[in-house]
Amino acid sequence: MKYRFLFFPLMGLCLAEPLFCMESPVVDTNGSRSSFDASNGILSKLNLPGVTTWRASKYKVSPGQEYEAALEFSCEELIPGAAASLQLVSLDASGREIGRIADPARFQQVYAENLPQKLKLRVKAGTGTAFIQPELKLGGNPLKVRIGRMTFGKYVPKPLFKGIYGEKDPMPPRVFALKDMAKLKASESWIAREAGRPVLYINGKKNAYKAYKGGTDYRLMCENGANIIVTHGGGGALYWGKEWDKQAYAGNGKFDFKRLEDNLLRIYAANPDAKVIVTVECDPDNAWLEAHPENIYLNEKGERGVARYTGFKGFGSSINQKKQERWAWTYASEAYQRHVIQGLKAMAEFLKQSPAGNIVIGFCLAGGHDGQYVQWRYGDETAGHADYSESFQAALRKWLKEKYGTDEALRRAWNDPEITLDTARVFTGKEWRSKPYFDTEPGIDRKITDCRTFLSVSTARMLRKFGNVLKEYFGRRCVIQTWYSSPVWRQTSRLAAEELAKGGIDIVAQVTDYAPPRLARAPGGSANYTIADSNLHNLLYVQEMDHRTWRTQEVGGWNYTAYPSGPAEFRSQVIRDAGSVLAAGGSGFYYYDMFGSWYHDPEALKIIRETYRMADWAEQKRNQVPRTEFAVFMDERDRLHGEGIANGGSAMKSLRMSGLTPDIYMLDDILNPELPEYKLYLFFSPMTITREQLNAILEKAYRKDAVVMIAGPAGVCGPFRSAEPVLKAFGLQIQDSMKPFSNVVAFDETVKDPLTERCTGRLGTLGVTIRKDDVAWLRNPFGAKITDAAAIVLGRWLGTSEPGLVVKRSEGRTLIYTPQIAGVSAQLINNAAKEAGILPPSEAGNAVYVGNGIAAGHRLADPIVIRFREDMNFYDPATGEKSGSGREIRLDCKPGESRAVLYERAVSQKK
C-alpha cells in the first residue's frame, strides 16, 4: 500500500456524526506497550518499540467527497524523540482497509508538553470507500497525551486570507532629494576583526547588524531600531525582470538604473540616517541564454533545465514565460559570469556617481535557484547534481588543470589511462549510481568527489568574483553579502566555506528553518549555520528572518511557513529565534518583508524593537561575558561524497534542547591555531577526517580536563576509509561492519552511569516516521561493532544486544562514542557537559540559548531557570531596565512562549 502525505492547516469543518464508537480503541503493535484511561482521554506509550494506535469512531462517507478530520490533543509528558501522527484510514463496506493517508513525517515530532495542539488532515473518499476512520498513532520515545475533541466532516474550503497592506513610503520630489543627497558624505562600511571575531563598521562606528529587507516600511522599521535597509526589488535586477520589478538592462550594452535611484531616494526620505545594502539580482535573461545555449543547465539526456520564478521545475524542451519560466543555467560558466560582471560594473559605477549612492554601504548578491545560488535540484540521488552543459565541462576542465597540472596526474587520480585535461568530463549517471557513497581513492571515487567539489568551489569563486568587481568599481569600502550553506543545512553547491572566505564576500546569511521548527511548539529554526566557523574566518553571520505575521497574505500550500495567529505567537517565534542567533555568536539579522506590510503594526514593531535592542546589547557585551565551553564540529564535505549519507544538521534539535549553546564549527577548524579551548567537544559524523585532523583532536580535545563525543560514522569517506583506525587512536576497539545492526540505539536502562541519568528511550531526536503499525528511523548506511571490553555500554542497537553507545574513561580522559547518525540526545549532551566540568546554563528539555550577553528561552517543558557560575546583572530587553542580579534567573513564560533577558557581569566582577 502506498502512503500519501498531506497536511492542510486552513480548513473549514462541516461536522458529521460517527456511525458507531469503538469498544476497544487502543491497539499496540510491534512491541509497543501502553495504558489508556478512557475517563479522561489520557493515552500513554510506555516504551520505545512499535506503535500505539488510538482509533476514533468510523464515519460514513460518500465516494468522491472530500472530508477533513481535526483532533485536539496535548502532550502531558514526553521524552524528546517522541512522535504523534494523525492518519485517516479508508474502509470498504466490510470494514477492510483500502487506503490510508498520514500527516507529513516532519510534523510528527512532538517537542512541547502542556501545549494544546490541533492536528488536521483531509482526504478525498475514493471509489469503494464506505467509511473513514481517524487514528492517532504514537511512536518513538515514551509520551503521554490527553486526547480531546475529534471532529470530522465534509471539507468546506475557506478563502485564503488576502493580507493587510499599507501604503509604501512615498517618493519625494526627485530633483530636490538628489540635491539634498549630494550634500552627504559618501558612506563606507567594512569588516574589522576584534577579539577573534568579525565586526561591522559603518562610517567608522561599530554597529550591530539590524536590518529590514523590503520595499514598504523603511520609516517605521528605522524608527524602531533598524540601521540597515537591504533592498528587495526596486530596480536591483540586472537582466531578468518581472512584471513587478523590471530589469535595468536597456539593450545594446546600456543600463537604466533610474528605478534603483528612485528607491534610494524613498529610503533617504523615510529615514535620512539609514544605510543601504543593494540587492543585486544576477540572473541572465532568456534572450541571452537562447543566444548562448551552451550555458543552459543540461541533464545526461541533453534536456534543458527549466526554472519557474526562483524554483526549479524540472527538465523540458520549452518554457512559458507568462508563468515566469526561464532556462536554468550553469553558475560555473565563464560566459555567464562575464555577462553578469558587465551589469555589476555598470551598477557600481552608476551608484558611485549618483548622489543617491551616498547612502549605499554594500551589495547583496542574489541569483539562481531560490535566489541564493543553491544547486538546481535540492536533492539528486539519481544524477548527483551533474551538469552536462558544455560551459560546465569547460569550467571543470580548467579547474582540473589547476588541481592536477598534468595529464598523467589526472590519469592516476581518476584511474583512467585515456583521460586528458582537455577531454575530462563530468561523471555519468551510471557511475554515480554505482555506489551509495564515494571516498577519495583513485578511480571513480576521486572522479565523483572532484566533480562535486568543483560544483561548490566554482559557486564560491563566482560569488567572490562578483563581490570583488563591485568593490573595485564602487570605488570605496563596502561590504558584500550573500547566502551560504553549512553542514547544518547542506546544499551541494555551497560547501566550500574556506574558498568563500578568501576575499570578496564579507557577510553570509541563512534563512531560518520553516515549519515545524518555527512553530510555537518547536525549539526554533534560526542559528542554523556553523556560526563559529564564520567568525573564525572573519565572515559576519546574519540571519534571514522572513517570519510571517497576522497581516501576511496566505498563499496556498505554504503551511510550512508557520503563520502566527497573532502578536503573542509572533513574539514567541522571533524572541526565540533572534535570541538564538545572538547567543550563538551571530552579528544580527534582517526581517524580510517579502510581500510588504508584514510588520506595519504597533504590536509587531514593539516586538521587533526588542530584538534590535538585544542585538545592540550583544554587540556591546559579547567580549565581556563568559563564553561557551562546548564546541560542535560538523564535516562540511560529507555531502560531496554522497547524497544524504550523514547529516550533522539532523542533530540540531537535540542541541537546541540540551540546555547549552555550543560554538558550531567545520571539521577543518580543528586545525586553526585561533580555535579557542573548550571542555566538551562533539564531532558529528567526521566521515572525511584526515590524519592531521585526528592528531589535532587528540592534542587539543582529548585532554584530562575535557570530554570528547563522536556521533555517527567516522573516517569512512576520507583517507582512512574506515572507522576502526579513527577510534583506535582514542584507545577504543571497534570493527567496521558492512551494515548496522539496527538504525537506532536505545539507552540501556539497567546501566547506572552519570551520563545516562534521566536518559531513556532512543538516542537522538529526529528520524522517526510513524507508518501504519511501526516506525521508520533515520537510515544508518554504515555500521561498527564495538568490541572494547573496557568500555561501559550505555546503549544498545534496538532489538539486539549489540553495544551502540559507549563511554571509555582511561587515564583521566573520556570518550563517548556511537556509530548512530545524529546519535545524541539533549539529556545526554547535558550530562556530558556536567562530566566535563561545565555548569549547563539550563537543564535539558526547553529551547534555551545563552551567550554573548543574551539569554533566551522558549518553554517546551518545565519552567526555565538560567544559571551562571558568577554573579550577573539582568536587564529587560523591552525597557532596558535592570530586573535583578545573581547567579540564577527564572524566565517566566508559559508553554510555547519565549522570553529573553540581557545579562552582564556584576560590577564588582567585570573584566
Can you name each region flagged by the protein language model?
Residues 20-174:
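Extracellular and organelle-lumenal recognition/adhesion modules and their flexible linkers in secreted
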Residues 163-222:
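N-terminal carbohydrate-binding accessory modules
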Residues 206-213, 235-258, 322-342, 443-461, ...:
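The substrate-binding groove and active-site-proximal loops of carbohydrate-active enzymes
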Residues 217-315, 348-352, 466-473, 688:
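Aromatic-lined substrate-binding rim segments of carbohydrate-active enzymes
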Residues 571, 684-911:
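A conserved amphipathic helix/loop scaffold
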